[in-house]
Structure formats: structure tokens, C-alpha cells
Amino acid sequence: MSTIKAIGFDMDYTLAEYKSPAFDELAYKGAVEKLIGMGYPEELRNFEYDSSKWCRGLIIDTQRGNFLKIDRHKYVRIAQHGFGVISSDYRKQIYSRTFNISPSFSEKHYVNVDTLFQLVDCSLFAATVTMKDEEEFAFLDGKTYEEMYRDVRASVDLCHRDGVIKDEVARNPAKYISKDDKMIPMLKQFKEDGKKVFLLTNSLWEYTLTVMNYLVGDDWTDLFDLIIVGSCKPVFLIDRFLNLFRIEEATGKLTNTDGVYEILEEKGGIGAETFLAKGKVFQGGNWLHLQAMLGINAGEE
């Protein structure tokens, strides 16, 4: 840790620990209604979200409607289709390796379940797969499993962006967010140790303000040297041309910046310290802005 100059945190599922299943059910029920609005059968409402059936580390085979649990040798230990377990013989027939070829699970129709947000996707996709296999719904007969997965993913994602989830959380944060008494002392200790502490979240300012006010209090921004909301990760880490906007904390007003050219003194800028003195809350940007404002040269610092 002695070589680390800056420490960053995400907000959702990091500083803000969401309560399951209450939080997940908001996304699940909201996505169900969106799918029904797209033409999916109303019987989709008969399925309930059950977090105990899903976990991170699974792989979704969107082409076949299957869910896989593999070991470190990429051997499929368990597989299920929709909510039903696939027999051992059939599982080996589909996913077993040959004498010189092992499955890579890197093709586009395989999706890694590596975030808690995706557990809702699993449950909802399994429900649509089950309904399609019943062959009782003409709308689903015209859909492939891959198309259904894309619909599920788009519906859940829209719930996170259009207010279906976050408006409800903002109305009653105690119902959906757990507090951690160790969080504030931890952040303060990092600053006392001379580390720069930053918040980098995909959530927008209004929601971030509500959640952090609940977790920490109205002075929560004092715990951070830099705050970036609406970061659009993972694109934030890839696209160097994303614009950086400064946020006026009191009003939420956005002002465009000249990016790294305004920050770096060697590029004719005013320097990170002077730049942040004008306001340390931003929206968007990319990793180059982050490094420039923190005064670090690489992610390793």
C-alpha cells in the first residue's frame, strides 16, 4: 500500500450495499412489465424472483437458454436449461471437450455472470426460456433464446436508467440500502495516511447525492478528493474522447471542461490542485481525466 497514491470506490454494490431481495425485486418486477409491454405474455408475472437460485460465476449460454457452472479447467460441472437441470449425458454431449479441443466459452453467445446486478437477468431469462419451451405462446415461438436474452438485458438495463429502480430507492433508502459503520472510519483513515480518495460511479448526481447523504450525511463530499458520476464504465476506461463536465453541487448544473488540456500544466493547463479548487464533482470523462486530476501517471499508482 505504500506505493499506492490514490484509492477509488464505486458506489453501487460497493459503498452502497443493496439489500437482497428487496432491491433485486425492483429491477425484476420493472423488467417484467417492460417485457410485457414489448409483447411478452402476461403470464410472465406468475414467476417470482428467487435470489437463492443464482450466483456470480455462472455462464449463460444465450444460444441454448442454458446456465453453466464450470470449474477452473473449464469443465461444465452443472448445467440447467431454464429452471430445469440438464442430464449428465446431455450436458457432456453439448459441452464436453474432445481429445485436443477444450471449450473456451469466449464466443459472443456466452455471458459471464460477474456482477450482482446480473442475478436478475438470470432469473428473468430462465422464466422466458421456460415459457418458450411450453410452446403455448405464439409470440415466444417467433423468438430465439438469444433474442429473448437481449430483450431481458435491455429491459433490466432500462430499469436502472429510467427511474423505475432509483426513484423508489430515493424515496425509501433505508428499505433498500444497508449501512456499514466501518465505512466512514475507513475513508478517513485512507486520507489520514496521505492517500487521495475518489468516487467513480455510473449513477448520476441526483441519485448519488441521495444515497451518499443517507450513508454518510450531508458532508459526505469532504471524504473524497474527487467525485465522478455518470462515468459510463466500462467505456470510461476505453474511450479517450469522452467529455468531462463539472457539476455545480447546489443545482446539478453541468459545465463542459477542456479536459486534460485545462488540467495539466505541461499542456498549458492550470494544474490539478487549482482545477479541483473550482469544484471536485464531475460527470463523464475518461481514465485520462481521472489520472490528471489525481496527479498520477498510471493505474498502478
What are these regions (language model features)?
Residues 1-301:
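HAD-like aspartate-dependent phosphatase fold
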